[in-house]
Every structure is written in structure tokens, then in C-alpha cells.
UniProtKB/Swiss-Prot annotation:
UniProt entry tagged with the keyword DNA repair: no
Keywords per UniProt: Cytoplasm, GTPase activation
InterPro entries xrefs: CARMIL_PH, Leu-rich_rpt, LRR_dom_sf, PH-like_dom_sf, PP1-Reg/Actin-Interact_Protein, Rho_GTPase_activation_prot, RhoGAP_dom
The keyword Aminoacyl-tRNA synthetase belongs to this UniProt entry's keyword annotation: no
Protein name listed in UniProt: Rho GTPase-activating protein gacW
Residue ranges of domain Rho-GAP in the record: 699-880
CDD domains: RhoGAP (cd00159)
Organism: Dictyostelium discoideum
Compartment(s): Cytoplasm
Residues carrying the site annotation Arginine finger: 737
Compositionally biased tracts (Low complexity): 898-929, 1013-1046
Known role: Rho GTPase-activating protein involved in the signal transduction pathway.
GO biological process: cell migration; regulation of actin cytoskeleton organization; regulation of aggregation involved in sorocarp development; regulation of Arp2/3 complex-mediated actin nucleation; regulation of cell migration; regulation of phagocytosis; signal transduction
Amino acid sequence: MTTPVSLSQVEKKTIESILTNKKEEGKLITKVTILNEKKKKLEIKTLILSSNRIFLFTDSKGKLSAEHHYLEITEIASQSENDVTIKFKNQNVMKMNLDASEVLKTLYGTLMSTFPGIKIGKTIIFNITPASRIPSIFQATSFKDIQGCGSFNLTYRSVCDHLGVQPLSSILWDIENLYPFNQVREFNLAEIYQYSFTDLKAILLSLSYNTYFQSFQSNGKLSNEDLNLLAEVFKENSSLQQLTITNSQASKEPIITLLQNVAENKALHLSHINLNNNSLENKGILTLGSSIQTFSNGLTYLNIENTSCSGKGLEAMFGCLTANNVVCGSMTHLNISNNKLESYGTNGLCKFLSKATALQQLLMSNTSPVYSFLKTSSSSIQTLDFSGNKSTTTKESVIDILSFFKQMSHLQTVNLSRIQTTPDDLKLLFSPATSLLKCSSVDLSENDLGDGGIIKLCEIMYPNSNLHHLSIDGNFKTKSKLRARAIEALINLIDDNTSIESLSLASGSGKYQLKGDLMPLLLSLLKNQSLVKLDISGNGVGDSGALAVSKILWKNQTLKSLKCDGNDFSYTALKMIKCSIRRNEKSLTILQLPLSDISTILKNDSNGSSHEKILKTIQDIQTSIVINYPNNIHPIDTSSGGLTPTKQPSIGSLAGVIKKPPIGPPSTPTKSSNPGFQTLPKRPTRGPLYPGRATGGAVTLTDKAQINASTIELPPLVSRSIDLLMEQGISSVGIFRTCASATALKKIKTRFEAGEDIDLKAENVDVDTVAGVLKSYFRELPNPIFPENLHEYFFQAMRQSSNEEIIQSLKDIIDQLSPLECKMIKKLFHLLHLISLEKDVNMMSPENIAICWAPTFFRSFASELLPINSFMIVNYFDIFDPENKPISSDNSGDADTDSTQSTCTTNNNNLVATSLSSPISPSTTPTKSIDNVLHTTVEVSRSPNHERAHTVGPMTSKRPISNNNGVSSNTPPLPNNVTPHHNTMPSRPSASPIKRPPSMGGSLSNFAGIPLSNHSSSGQLNNNNSNNNTTSNSSNSSSGKSSSNPSPIPTPPDSPSMSYIGDGKSTLRSKRFSRVNRVSYSPVLPRAWTNESRTVSSLFQDDLDSNSDSSGPSL
């Protein structure tokens, strides 16, 4: 007791007895003078201020005269230093003469320490005059009595004392021991065990007068009376920021009252509201919207899923949200699922989305939107749940919502399950016109795609290097003849698209089981090094499937999470899984027990003899997984404050520190700022071979100028591959379009990724395989060479009026790349340029090369990018290497041609005429004597820089000509009046014509100075009408020489054979080519090529009908 007061023994004994019975502790005791209203006289009494109540005792015997709880006080007034008046809710008034300053300080300090959330000036009024006394009373008050959890235990005890209720010991223990341990500020009614209505009333009233908790959650049944009590909480409380009331099963009226109190309480700042599964109807939704419209601090989370509201109610709510600019700029999560949008709600949603600049998650499943009204969206949306939204009318189609998806430029996760889409609709949805191809998580469950649809889906998803999770549950409704191809397409997809980390193939709600059809996919995971999470629940694969799973778990070190319930596993299957996990210390870390299968096993064991064995096996599986955790923990840098090497993380946090084994050389581990609180890890970047894009900021031109290009080393895979292709692959027919051996390609890639520097030439690796490895490298880069943010700059560059301006604009774009990227693409485009110059031989014009490489460079299949890529290939030297651009000569308009050049041209004409006029059978080739004449008669001027064919640039070698029958011979460059017949390979049409620069005109006289080659290939020449006579006369003088040696030169085994048709046209017979969709690595075609697997839609093939009248290469 702070103030000593002399009391008689009788008074002291009586007061201590009363305080002990009431479990009160006195804070202040003093003598006061009180006016007795009945007796109209002053009486001296003893005043005691305890922790919860005010006591008055008589001065003589210590008899209790009056007591009042602090929560009964309505006003405390003091007009001078010697008087205090206290008013109570029951209209009682206590007027006292005493030292007012000490009493007021004790009253205020006790109130604020016991009820930190009580509103001074509203709940209790302090009326103190003069005002100069207020600072000395309030500011000098100490709050040392405030305990852990904001003194919530004191508040709860005091409220229980006020209501006459015994406090729940479980709540007091939790408040004193659990909540302070990890700073939990979420009050969840589900954590309170067995409470009555009065207990709930005491708890909620305590929340009203305390400021510790910031979140209130209730997920269960609440009566109307309970909700009315909760409404009073939100009328008084000023600290709660999150409100969650779900599945209350109450009427809408008490919830409406609660929302009205929220709007009236200006001290309350809710940022999170979750009212799902409550019957709010339109009236409740409108009240909610009106309340949110009054918010001044914004709202980040709103969930009104399944609240029985119609389109008009939603339209009214969206109107209120749109009217509050603060809410539009702060809301990040909106869930309106299982409500009917209809036309009114769809319009309101679009208006809100047009202003919702911060919205990241939009969940609108089963809302029946009108497709044609979905015109506006938000570019900030990252997660979209559009599941269950079928078209409302037969006239609506996916085309109506393309603009809705197109505006979501940052979309990462999309759920399109149960929308009954078709494969053709999927092609539209995942076209470059939308942003869905950028999504890392795609859910297409229960769309009844069937086997054919799965094949189409794999083809669509194949180029998506951003895809990490794919869910196709319940799509195998009916088995067809395409089932094997569908499974193989999935295998190829997850094998080739190494970004896919999670795959879900569960049976879905329709229970469409794959059974034995799933076996090839399971066995393919033995060597898979990218998949981290797999779900095959409900497919009924049986013990044979369990055997495949056990082999996977035994060998695979990447797969960390597996769901396999509902597969008819027996006790033997459980034992196999147990043994495989034990034998692989880097096996699973998350395995959901197959409870339904275990239940079936136990039911079938009627005698119960195997129950103990089954239980022991399950325990061994769990123990093995726990033992495997330390082997899957990513090393943590102890300097960053992480776990020490000897400290073992708790089981609850171990799932967040899983790391996949790296592919290739190990990279330096990065520091983790928050270890133990991550989800499944991302696939690591594939070592130094995959540099990706620099993350340290853009490299300025000044920085580039200071970097010596000779100090930048290209990845061995790139440099070795390009060097070999320059030397051996420039004239290879169909280079980059020809299908390479998938096995050989993977072997080469694996060796390079392991850090081995392979001598491709010494090992005699096929050029098609090297081309496939090179293209695969650029396709698998974490970021494309030309990212999406540069695409618009490319389009603007191509709109320039002249070639010079276009070239300069493209050079400016190239300068924005990192030095390593600049060096890589410079060397790669040099190769492509050289290949394009041999288009008459290799049938790869710049347009055809662009079809192969544009999707890889730009990571897009937009046809508008093809002419850009083609232009860069043709104008390589102008864009990438203007210093070494060869000097081309044009003799067609020069009257003073030098005699040597004139002699060369004349000889060329004579030789061409000779070869064209000589009747040679298709089985023969030019004689050796002609080859000698070509080498001895024609003199070609070389540039000093032209030492090797692959370093010459546009002045490359190996340009053959052929006679009318398609037989080729090595010749020097042709004069101006002879034009070659260009490659007739079919190619994708460009969006706009490409202007050929002057150095690449139709006249072949520009190619004077190229070195000769001994390599023979196929080609064709069509002479202009203007030089027919000259050619004919020249042929008479050399016809004898051309036929002196009729013996044919054998064709090398590796060179393609040519089939000749009556009109002299030739077609390729030995090679097959892929289309723009990269079908050379397509997941939808078998790896072993057969006649059954060759289709017009996937191959440029040559199956010609012997009776057909063809004029060129045909499909």
C-alpha cells in the first residue's frame, strides 16, 4: 500500500479478510471525507483502490460501505486539488474530499495497465479543471504494471470479476506461456476448448479493452447472440487489423450489425476481411461495400467466397470499392468465388479491375461471368483462379476473353480447371497474344482433354521455359489409340523442358484411372533430374506401379515430394517403398501416406495378424524420411546468422530447406536471409554453362568500352559447336532443321554440362547433333537472348525508312546486352550468315533460318519476329562486324572492266553453257577433266583476310552450279547475267517483306573473291532469257571437254541423295525437316521415327507419288 494510514486492529482485520475473499490487491489506501446524502452530514471513511475495484469502508469497525468495479465508471471529475467525483453506470455518485492528485494518478494508472484499449474520453470521461493539472496527472503515470501479451491476462481476470465468471485456466495458461513465446497476435476461437456463452462473453469483452491481438479468427458455428457480442468488440477495439468469420451458419443481420460498427469505429483500421461461406446475400454485401468505402487506411485482403450474392449485389459492392481510391491502390487479394457475377457483376468487376493497380491475386471460380463483358483487367495480377467458368451461352467462346487475359502481363499462376476447354481453345489461350505462356504454374484439371488433347497440350507447353508446375488431373476419361502417344508426349515434355518441377496426374473427382498406362512415365523418372514434386493419386497402378515407384525412389535424387494414395497398393508395395527410401539417402523428404490403401489393407486382414507388421512398416517409412532430412539440407552460411553446421533444424521447418542436386559443376552457395521458412526450392541454374542474364544491373556503353573482348570466354559448348559447324556444317542440307538423334544429343549436352571440354571434330560428332546441342543451349537459357522488354524496340527499328536507319537501330539494341551475350550472338550470327550464303546447297535461306532460330532468340512464336531475325542474318557485317565487312564488286554496270576480270567472266559463261548443254544422265556427275579446267582456267582474287572459308563472312565458298538434270560441279562465282535458282524449301511466310541490302543483290558477280571448294552438292540454275543465246553459243566450244570422262564420282555415304523429276527439279529424299514449332525436339512425336509417326503437320517430308506432276520439293 502506497500511503500509510493508521487503522485499528478491527479495521485492519476486516479489510484484509474482505480483500482476500475477493482476491484483490490494494494499490492505494487513504482516508476520505464523504457527504452522506441521506443523513446530510460528512463522514470519514477509508478508501481503497485495488486492482479491479473501488472499496469504501466505515471508519470505526471497517465494515464494507460500498464497492464498484472500474468498468462501471462512466466519469471521473475533479474541480480542485482536494475533491474527486466518480460517476457510475447505475447512476451512483461518489463525492470525496481528499488529495485528488494521488487518487487520480492511481485511478488512471490502474485503468491503463488493466485495460490498455479502453477509450479515455469515450468509455470513461476525465473532467479535470483547470486544464493545467492534466499533464501532471497523465504524463507522470507509469505503466510498469503492463505485463506480457499487453496485460491480456489482467484484462481477462478483471472482466471475469466484473461478470462474476470464473476465468478459464486454459486461457490464462496459454496467455502466460504460449503466446509470448513466438509473438502470436492472432486470436483463434478454435484454440479455446469447451467454453460456454458466458465464457465467450468474457473473452470477447476482454478483446474490446485490450490492444495486444491484431487478428480475430472464427471458423465454425456461431449463434446470433455470439455475433452480437462480437459486434460490440469491433465497436470498442482499436487494434484489430484482420477479421475472419467463416462457416458461422448464422443469419445475415448480426453480421450486418458488425459491419456497421466497423464503419462507425474510426479508430479501427481493418486491412484483412474474410467472410466466406456466410449467407450475406445482397443486403450484407452492400453493407460490406459501404463500410469499406469509409476506410481511410486501405484494405489489402477481401474474401467473400460463397456468400449467396447475385450480380446486382456484387455490382453495388464493386461500385463502393471503386469509389475509394485508397482501397483500389492497396487491395492485393480478392476472392469472389462461388457467387454469380452475371452481366451486372461482370461489368462492376471490370470497372474495379481497371483501377486496382495493386491487385495480385484474383480468385473468381464458379462465378458465371459473361465472356463478352470481360474486357478489362489489371496488369498487376499474378494469380488467377478462373476454374469452373464455362461459357454461359453457346455463342460465347474463348476468343471473347482473350483481351481479358492479354492485359495480365505479370500473370504467374493460372487455374483453368473445369472450364471445358478444347485443345483448339488452349492453343488460343496460350498463344503469344496472351501472357499465359509466361505462367510458372498452370492447372488444367478435369477439362476432359482426352489423349489427343494431352498431346496438343504438351506441344503447346513445350516452349514454355517458365513452367514449373503443371496439373492435368482427371483428363484421361476415355482410353483411345492415342494413349501411348499421350504418355510419351508427357515423358518428352518433362524430359526436355527441365524447368518443370511439379507434375500432377491424379485421377481427379471423376476417378479416371490410368493404371498400367502410367508405367512408362514412372520409369522415365529414373534419370529425370528436374522433377521435384509428383502426384499420381487415384490411378490404381497396383503393385507393379509400386515397384516402379520404388525403383525411382532408389535411384532418383531430385524427387522430394510424392503423393501416391489410391493406387491399390498392398502390404508388399509398402515394403518395397520402405526399402527404396532407406537405400537412397537423398530420396523423398515429403511423402503423404497412402491412407486409403492402408485402410483397405487393414480391412482385408480380417484376422488382424498383419496389423503389427503394417504399423511397423509405416513407422519405418516415416523414420527413413526423417533420417533423410539432413542429407537434403542446403548448406547455410553461418556468417549470415543462419543455422550452424551442428545445429539440427526442427522437423516442422525441414521441408523448407530441400535442395535439388545441381547439374554440372557446383556453383557457389548463396546466402539465405531467412533459412527454414522457404517452400520447395527452385531448380538451380545449370552451372557456368548457362550464364543467363546479368542481375547486377545493365552494362553501360562506357563499361562495355572498358571491357576487353578477348578477356571474355564463351562457354565451351558454344565455342566448340560454332567452330565445328563453321568448318563442316555450312553446306549441310537442312542444318538446324534436321532431326538429330535424341540419345546422342543428350550425351553431348550432359558431358558439356559436367564441365568436359569436348573436341567435337576429333570425336567425329555429326553436324546435326552439334546443331541440336547449340540450339538447345540457347533455348534453355534462364532468360532469352532478346527478352520481351526489347521486342517493341525491334519492331520500332524495323519501321525505319531506310536500311541504314534500321541497321543503326538494331546496333543500338545489341549494345544493351551484356558483353558475354554480345560476343555469343556475334559469333552465332556469323555462323547463320555463312549458312544463309549457301542456301542453294543447304536449302536454308535466311527466312528458313529465322523460322528455326527466332523462337529461340525471342522466346516467342510471333510471326512478326521472323523478318527481324532474317534481316539480322542477311546484314550480319553491317550490324555486328562493320570493320571486317568484305568489299563487294559489281561489274554489271561498269564499262571499264579489267581484262582479267573480263576473261574470268567469259570463261565462266562458256563453262556454264557447256555444262548446261551436255546431256548427262541423272546418275552421273561432272567429270574430273571439267573439274581440272575449272581449277586451271579461272583465277579468283582473294582478300588478305580470307584465309579460311568460315572466316570470310558473305564471301564464302562452296557455291555449286548444276546442269538441267541437277548434277552439280564446283565452279567459280557466276557473272551478272546468270542468276541462281533459289532454295525452294517451304518456309513460313514473313509478316512483311525484307529489303535486301545492296551487298546481297541478285547478281552473283558480287561474290568475286571467294575461295573454291572441292565439296560437291546439289543445286539448280535457271537462266535469264536475256542470255540464252550467249549460253548456247558458248556451249558448242566446250561440249567435247565436258564429256571426255563419263565415269561417275560416287556420292559420300553421309550426303543426301537427290531424286530427279522430269523437269529437272530435285527433292531431298534422305532427310526430314521440322517446322517452326521445334518439332525436332517435339514432345508429341516418338523419338524413334517410323512411317506411322510421320505426318504432314509435323514434318517436311518427301513421300512423292510416282504419278504426280511435281515442280519442286513437296511436303
